Amino acid sequence: MNLMSVDGYQARISYDPETDQFRGEILGLSGGADFYGSNPDELRREFKQSLEVFLEVCREQGIEPRKQFSGKFNLRIPPELHEQLSLEAEAQGKSLNALAQEALQNSLS
């Protein structure tokens, strides 16, 4: 995945063949914000401008710009995997939640 960072925000970068430009989509926002550029410098400038506009609109409307997360989500897995993970957690003296949290954290390393 191609990512670009500006001021603590990240954007996923892709190529748009219809416009013959690169497209960025800012991640983790409470709303949508994208931008286009023909080269990396232009893309970064447009990223900054798009982010500034988005943040200004959020300030004006009293909206939190970043998505808020509760720390909880549902995960659907096959029953066999659920059983294997439960047994592994028990063998390690951990809760299933702790085992899953470690595995997810390790996937980001």
What are these regions (language model features)?
Residues 1-21, 25, 49, 56:
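N-terminal segment of the canonical double-stranded RNA-binding domain
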Residues 12-14, 36, 74-76:
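Generic structural detector for well-ordered beta-strands
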Residues 27-30, 67-69:
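Short glycine-enriched loop/turn motifs at secondary-structure junctions
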Residues 30-41:
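A short, exposed loop/beta-hairpin motif centered on an aromatic-Gly-Thr core
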Residues 39-53:
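A short, charged, amphipathic alpha-helix used as a generic interaction element across diverse proteins
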Residues 60-76, 80, 90-94, 98:
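Short Lys/Arg-rich basic patches
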Residues 96-109:
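Short, basic amphipathic alpha-helical segments that act as recognition/interaction helices
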